[in-house]
Regions:
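Flexible, glycine/charged-enriched surface loops at secondary-structure junctions
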Residues: 27-33, 49-56, 91, 146-155
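PLP-dependent enzyme catalytic core of the Aspartate aminotransferase-like
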Residues: 96, 100-162
Length: 162
C-alpha cells in the first residue's frame, strides 16, 4: 500500500518522455552506431600491428569497441588520446578511475598484460563519421610513438628481423 499522492508524478512523466525519445527511430540509431563501430574496429585493426578486437566481432553492443593494443600501457595510451581530443576508457564504466585491467577481459581469458593494453570506445548517436576518421588518423601514430619508447617493442622488432 501506498497513500494517494506519494507517487513522483513529474518523475514518472519525465521517464515516459525519456523512453519515447530513446525509442524514436531506435533501429536507425542502432544501425548508425553499428556502422560507426565497425568502421572504427576495421580501421584500427588494419592500421595498427599487434592490435586485436576483444570480444565477439558481431555479437556485441552496437556502440562498443574494445581494442587490445599489445606492447603499450592502456593508461598511457588513454592519456595521449585524451591530449588529442579522443575520449576512451581502459575498463568498464563501473570501474572507471581504477588502474586495474578490466575484470570482464580477464574473465574472457585475456592475459593480464594484454588486458592492461586494452581500451574501450563507447559510441553514441551523436558521434559522427568524421570523429571516427579522427581516431583512425591519430591513434596509429600515438601507438607507434609509445612503442618507439618501449624496450619490449624493441625486443619484438628484433625478433621479427631474425
Amino acid at each position: 500500500g501506498r497513500r494517494a499522492g506519494t507517487e513522483n508524478v513529474p518523475g514518472i512523466v519525465g521517464l515516459a518522455k525519456a523512453m519515447e525519445l530513446t525509442y524514436t527511430d531506435f533501429d536507425a540509431k542502432i544501425e548508425k552506431m553499428t556502422k560507426l563501430r565497425d568502421k572504427l574496429i576495421k580501421g584500427l585493426l588494419e592500421s595498427i600491428p599487434y592490435c586485436k578486437l576483444n570480444g565477439h566481432p558481431t555479437k556485441r553492443l552496437a556502440n562498443n569497441a574494445n581494442i587490445g593494443v599489445e606492447y603499450v600501457e592502456g593508461e598511457s595510451l588513454l592519456l595521449l588520446l585524451d591530449m588529442n581530443g579522443i575520449a576512451a576508457s581502459s575498463g568498464s564504466a563501473c570501474t572507471s578511475g581504477s588502474l586495474d585491467p578490466s575484470h570482464v577481459l580477464l574473465a574472457l581469458g585475456i592475459p593480464h598484460e594484454k588486458a592492461h593494453g586494452s581500451i574501450r570506445f563507447t559510441l553514441g548517436v551523436q558521434n559522427t563519421e568524421e570523429e571516427i576518421d579522427v581516431v583512425l588518423e591519430k591513434m596509429p601514430a600515438i601507438v607507434q610513438r609509445m612503442r618507439d619508447m618501449s624496450p619490449l617493442w624493441e625486443e619484438v622488432k628484433n625478433a621479427m628481423k631474425n
